[in-house]
């Protein structure tokens, strides 16, 4: 049972989905099919040349 947290592109709410048993991937709040995985807020250091 692999649950993953996604964010809805339309309403912005976080949705937890079980991808093993989910028949369709939709936001339960607004019905949008566009969900994306939120990126962690980690600052990355880039070495200057």
Curated annotation (Swiss-Prot):
Source organism of the structure: Thermococcus kodakarensis (strain ATCC BAA-918 / JCM 12380 / KOD1) (Pyrococcus kodakaraensis (strain KOD1))
Keywords assigned by UniProt, alphabetized: Chromosome, Cytoplasm, DNA-directed RNA polymerase, Metal-binding, Nucleotidyltransferase, Transcription, Transferase, Zinc
Catalytic activity: RNA(n) + a ribonucleoside 5'-triphosphate = RNA(n+1) + diphosphate
Oligomer status and interactors: Part of the RNA polymerase complex.
Function text: DNA-dependent RNA polymerase (RNAP) catalyzes the transcription of DNA into RNA using the four ribonucleoside triphosphates as substrates.
Signal peptide (UniProt feature, chain positions): none
Family: Belongs to the archaeal Rpo12/eukaryotic RPC10 RNA polymerase subunit family.
Coiled-coil residue windows: none
GO molecular function: DNA binding; DNA-directed RNA polymerase activity; zinc ion binding
Principal location: cytoplasm
Gene3D superfamilies the UniProt entry points to: RNA polymerase ii, chain L
Location of this chain's protein in the cell: Cytoplasm; Chromosome
Pfam families assigned to the protein according to its UniProt record, in alphabetical order: Zn_ribbon_RPAB4
Protein name per UniProt: DNA-directed RNA polymerase subunit Rpo12
EC number: 2.7.7.6
């Amino acid at each position: 049972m692999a649950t993953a947290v996604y964010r809805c592109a339309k309403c912005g709410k976080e949705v937890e989905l079980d991808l093993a048993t989910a028949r369709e991937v939709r936001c339960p709040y607004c019905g949008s099919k566009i969900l994306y995985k939120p990126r962690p807020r980690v600052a990355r250091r880039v070495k200057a040349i």
